[in-house]
């Protein structure tokens, strides 16, 4: 039985990570503390905005469903 592709990828990931040197990032600068705090705050605000939009979109709209007069024997609490 052949292992799935992602399993092979996960097994080879440490090998690929060990091949890269620590200073291989050319042109990368350090992040200042205010910039890092701003990025974290912006991420938190965007996450809350996404959660709010999903909450508003998933709310039931309009009037509630009307109860019908049917008797459901196998459903407790109905009829």
From Swiss-Prot:
Phosphorylated; PIK3R1 and GRB2 associate specifically with tyrosine-phosphorylated HCST. O-glycosylated. GO terms for biological process: natural killer cell mediated cytotoxicity; positive regulation of phosphatidylinositol 3-kinase/protein kinase B signal transduction; regulation of immune response. Keywords: Disulfide bond, Glycoprotein, Membrane, Phosphoprotein, Signal, Transmembrane, Transmembrane helix. GO terms for molecular function: phosphatidylinositol 3-kinase binding; protein-macromolecule adaptor activity; signaling receptor binding. Residues 72-75 are annotated as: PIK3R1 binding site. Residues 1-17 form the signal peptide. Residues 18-35 are extracellular. The chain crosses the membrane at residues 36-56. The modification Phosphotyrosine is found at residue 72. Residues 72-74 are annotated as: GRB2 binding site. It comes from the Eukaryota. It holds the Pfam family DAP10. Belongs to the DAP10 family. Immune reactivity to healthy cells that express KLRK1 ligands can happen under physiological conditions; NK cells are able to reject syngeneic bone marrow grafts when the bone marrow cells expressed sufficient KLRK1 ligand. This is Hematopoietic cell signal transducer. It comes from Mus musculus.
């Amino acid at each position: 039985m052949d292992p799935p592709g992602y399993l092979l990828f996960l097994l080879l990931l440490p090998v690929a990570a060990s091949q890269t040197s620590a200073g291989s990032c050319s042109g990368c600068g350090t992040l200042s503390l205010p910039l890092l705090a701003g990025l974290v705050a912006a991420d938190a605000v965007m996450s809350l905005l996404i959660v709010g939009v999903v909450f508003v979109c998933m709310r039931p709209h309009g009037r509630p469903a009307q109860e019908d007069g049917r008797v459901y024997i196998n459903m407790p609490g109905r009829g």
